[in-house]
Amino acid sequence: MADPATQLSQWDFRRFARSDLTPMLQQYVEVKAQHPHCLLLYRMGDFYETFLADAEIVSRELEIVLTGRQAGDKIGRIPMAGIPHHALERYCAQLIEKGYAVVICDQVESPEQAKERARQAKVARRSKSDGDAPLLPLLLEDGEQIDWEGAESVLVRRAVTRVLTPGTVLEDQLLVGRRNNYLAALVQAGECWGLAFADISTGEFQVTQLESAEALVQELLRLQPAEVLLSGDAPDPLVLLRPGEASSERPECLPSQFCYTLRPRRYFELDEARRLLMETFGVRSLEGFGCENLPLAVRAAGGLVQHLLETQRGVSIPLEGIRTYTLSQYLILDHQTRRNLELTQTVRDGAQYGSLLWALDRTRTVMGGRALRRWLLQPLLDTRAIGRRQDSVAELYDEGLLRERLQRILESVYDLERLAGRCGSGTANARDLVALGESLLKLPALAEAVAASTSPYLKALQSIPVELERLGEKLRRTLVDTPPLILTEGGLIRAGVHPELEGMRGQLIEDRDWLVDLEARERARTGIQTLKVGFNKAFGYYLSISRGKAEKAPPEYLRKQTLTNEERYITPELKERETRILNAQQQTNQLEYDIFNILRQEAGRHVSALRQVARRVAALDALAGLAEVAVYHDYCRPVLGEGREVHIEAGRHPVIEQAIPAGFFVPNDARMGAEAEPDLIILTGPNMSGKSSFIRQVALIQLLAQVGAFVPARGAVLGVADRIFTRVGAVDDLATGQSTFMVEMTETANILNHATPRSLVLLDEIGRGTATFDGLAIAWAVAEYLASHIRCRTIFATHYHELNELASVVSGVANYQVTVQELADRIVFLHRVTPGGADRSYGIEVGRLAGLPPSVVARARTVLAQVEQHSQIAVGLRDSNGSASESAAG
């Protein structure tokens, strides 16, 4: 995808001489030149305006009106598009979602302050001259020269206050509540990679070092970062590549679906990265974080922090300490497995509905939803950690009243993780603090509810820091229940909280009462009963008289404005009172804002304690949801050990059973991996019989067990798996030019090269994407290799019934089938998995059910009979394996 500036080169700001632009647009271009690859939102009064190429992009992407503005005599009219200041977050969210970086340029003084600044500058310069010398241009802070001949032409000072990129947003409207918003950074050295990622809205900050590009790509696909930082040689300090946009700076091995931001290589130098990280976290060494000897990870982390310092423009980002991890700590799920198992979204339409997350998510808070999502994508290997989660689910399973009580409380808890982050960064608004206060006041009820609990995750909430309870009380006492979004216009602080504020409010009430009395007095004095006292921002307070009564206006009334139906007047007395009221209101608003700021800073000092409690509440919420699912859908607690067994009694698919009417799902057993049990099951049966559902079911039960959840079965004993592999279905990869069969073979090769005896492998229809004989040969060889060389636990679903012969020539292989019942005119799918191999696939019956013409069905039966009569594949395989076995014995 081309850079927007070159895409819309007619209006590229670099094409215009600055001297040809109006002073305001000179200021705009000055800022734009510092951020050429970002969309610049430039505050003008009540709007954020965009100009030139940016305006065309914003108009197109946001579907707002494209207007124009005079840019100067030589240039004429240029494109302009604006958004109201109160809708900034909503529109920024849309732009960021589309992969743009956005620069916010705000007014840092009022027009009145700008005029006063110009007046004082003019006086100062004249005092240094003889009074007759011409005025000299004044050099502004941003380098622009303006001739101050009149205060009316003064430019208001503006400054960049935020640089918003997809991975650096904090505002609620710019985030998805139940998903983390990760910013990642990468550093490469040979085959190795350093990876750092952070969610600045929650403070999470993790690093790792990976031995291959393949491992890196799998981690990126798990994390789904909103933005990935790369070191590059681009001349601009921030170049953002939108999804799919080509660049020689992005290594070919990296997925093109993410936003990549190119940053200068100096940000990723080891010494500078180490210094910056130690300074950020106030430590003398990185050893305590476990990454001192991981130079690539340290470099990536340093580049990430430097990026935050530049984009946040003075906003403090309170990241938690660095956590170092390795892939070997978790059950590894590659992207294809996560996709095939539909963990967080369906393959068909990418929706959450119909996914495992949909079936399990009963969380009451968004932070609990994020925790559950992370757990599903990164199951555990440590049986002790798994057991701690299981113990908590078990207690909440057994104690139904406790679970329901906790969930009722949790329904009133807001996103403590992100609220804490906004308090720590100083960006929280008054409604954030109200939500924080309400949430903190729920914590004592949670602590009381779990006071007698014995499981670890519940016990963690038995003690709430006293300072957080006090903070919650203070927030409730100080702030009104529904404060305004704008912090500088008053209405934030409750009555009776601050003596000085109460005195100022009392004076305002007296002055406004005076206005009411003035209206009554003037009506009586003039005899004009329709006379009113009004106010607007342009003219302040005025006396309004209808046009028909205007001749009765006293001579001391000074006409200020004439409208269609009324005349508006002022008096010296009214203007004097107006000045008093407006000054008092401004002082009152400022005092309220000062009180709010002190309160926000106090909350920010507790960010670490807030986040610690938030993580505990999120975990409790996720576990309570898992317990609720277990109760309502009759799940059991699995037994996990260090063996290799997969013993599932009456297992069910957790998603399908919720998507169909209750009682319709047919449970099935699975036994493999232990002594005297097969390592590999050849699963045959008709189309539509449920083979694919069964193999996914086994994988999901294994995964849920290692998450620490209960599982949909009557009983389950499972050995911990180090990896789960699935190869289920395939489509052409048009982006890389790979056919369906090539994709299938690539995925199969990945499994054969990485599976271990502790892995769980689920294969469906290997070899079906090519000629029958080739496909059968590959399927046989793959199954044989898994059974005899890797000896991992495998279920191999196939329509190649000849593979049933493998059990007679390779040890550790067993045949199972999904049964049907044949009636006179149709077949009934029983969906029951039983020992033995099927000898028919009933594909023609499925075609008949799908509506194939009767003549086609009849012809297919004839052809099938001829093929079966002359096929000697099974005999040949049996003979060749028998000969091979005899040769090996000899």
From Swiss-Prot:
Keywords: ATP-binding, DNA damage, DNA repair, DNA-binding, Nucleotide-binding. GO terms for cellular component: cytosol. It comes from the Bacteria. ATP binds at G685, P686, N687, M688, S689, G690, K691, S692. Pfam families: MutS_I, MutS_II, MutS_III, MutS_IV, MutS_V. CDD domains: ABC_MutS1 (cd03284). GO terms for molecular function: ATP binding; ATP-dependent DNA damage sensor activity; damaged DNA binding; mismatched DNA binding. InterPro entries: DNA_mismatch_repair_MutS (IPR005748), DNA_mismatch_repair_MutS-lik_N (IPR007695), DNA_mismatch_repair_MutS/MSH (IPR017261), DNA_mismatch_repair_MutS_C (IPR000432), DNA_mismatch_repair_MutS_clamp (IPR007861), DNA_mismatch_repair_MutS_core (IPR007696), DNA_mismatch_repair_MutS_N (IPR016151), DNA_mismatch_repair_MutS_sf (IPR036187). One of its GO terms (biological process) is mismatch repair. NCBIfam families: mutS1, PRK05399.1. This protein is involved in the repair of mismatches in DNA. It is possible that it carries out the mismatch recognition step. This protein has a weak ATPase activity. Belongs to the DNA mismatch repair MutS family. HAMAP family: MutS. This is DNA mismatch repair protein MutS. It comes from Gloeobacter violaceus (strain ATCC 29082 / PCC 7421). The lineage of its organism: Bacteria, Bacillati, Cyanobacteriota, Cyanophyceae, Gloeobacterales.
